[in-house]
Regions:
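Short, small-residue-biased leader/transition segments that mark boundaries at the very start
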Residues: 1-3
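Substrate-binding cleft/loops of secretory-pathway carbohydrate-active enzymes
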Residues: 14, 20-63, 68-79
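Active-site clefts of carbohydrate-active enzymes
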Residues: 19-39, 76-112
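Substrate-binding cleft of secreted/luminal carbohydrate-active enzymes
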Residues: 50-73, 87-160
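Pro/Thr/Ser/Gly-rich low-complexity, intrinsically disordered linker/stalk tracts
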Residues: 139-140, 144-195, 250-260
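Solvent-exposed loop/turn segments flanking beta-strands in beta-repeat/beta-sandwich domains
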Residues: 189-215, 239
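Short beta-strand segments within Ig-like beta-sandwich modules, predominantly Fibronectin type-III
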Residues: 219-225
Length: 260
């Protein structure tokens, strides 16, 4: 990474530390001990020293274009994760190959890659191109909705920028008006950092206390202000108990205030 690029990263962080600086490099960095890159890689072919940038700590996220399968995908995805320096690796998946005119991959191939990503602790995946996702090519959209993206997700924290959680909110009250809407209100977190003022995550569950480690319990996130109206589309699915946490722009989440 040249000095100028280092200055760019430091300049961004000086102005807005929570802004993520990321790169979308060629999918294979170098030959690995597990499998060769077969002559086309980021480092030697297009001079992208991305793992060097990760080592310097001047990247927050990497989206390697891993539009491959088999031995051209798995060893290189793992290599990125092993050299991540704690940063977030989000492989780009070549879902356009599901189209018969592009490659006629099967849906199983993409699903195996996503299971691998989760099993090895990578931060997520990107889908290229979105057209093939929205067109539900080979049932991809349905598979993601039913099997992979079944619950909301909070943004991953960036502890190398800020690892201090905001103070929790307090005084959570829950009103149940006659129209079936739940009105939640609370006292704000007491943090004074106006540039990194926390927002709130609302959780709901049928059991008490509400388990805020379970994403299935997330009802809303990035809530501003100190009130929230819970209006379930299907009243018979309404949650019974509620909790609220504060979360800052770097993804640090406070302890929860539980409904009393």
């Amino acid at each position: 990474m040249c000095i100028r690029d280092s200055y760019i990263y430091k300049g961004v962080k000086a102005m807005k530390p929570w802004v993520k600086v990321s790169t979308c490099p060629v999918g294979k960095y170098k030959d690995t001990s597990r499998y060769p890159s077969r002559g086309w890689n980021a480092f030697h072919t297009v001079y992208q020293d991305v793992q060097g940038w990760l080592g310097e700590g001047i990247q927050d996220q990497i989206y390697p274009m891993l539009y491959f399968r088999g031995n051209h995908f798995y060893p290189f995805a793992l290599d990125w994760q092993e050299q991540s320096n704690g940063r977030q690796i989000i492989p780009g998946l070549g879902i356009y190959f599901l189209d018969p005119s592009e490659g006629n991959w099967t849906l199983d191939e993409i699903e195996r890659q996503m299971h691998f990503i989760r099993a090895h602790g990578l931060a997520g995946e990107a889908h290229y191109r979105v057209k093939y996702l929205m067109d539900n090519t080979q049932g991809l959209y349905e598979a993601l909705e039913e099997d992979f993206y079944t619950a909301p997700a909070l943004q991953p924290a960036m502890p190398w920028i800020d690892n201090v959680a905001p103070t929790p909110p307090s005084g959570l009250t829950v009103e149940t008006p006659e129209n079936g809407y739940w009105k939640l209100s609370w006292q704000p977190a007491t943090d004074n950092d106006k540039r990194n003022a926390p927002m709130y995550v609302i959780y709901g569950s049928d059991t008490y206390p509400v388990d805020t480690s379970n994403p299935e319990n997330i009802l809303a996130q990035r809530v501003q202000g100190t009130e929230y109206t819970y209006a379930p589309i299907r009243p018979w699915t309404a949650r019974k108990y509620f909790a609220v946490t504060a979360i800052d722009r770097c993804g640090n989440e406070s302890e929860a205030i539980q409904q009393q």
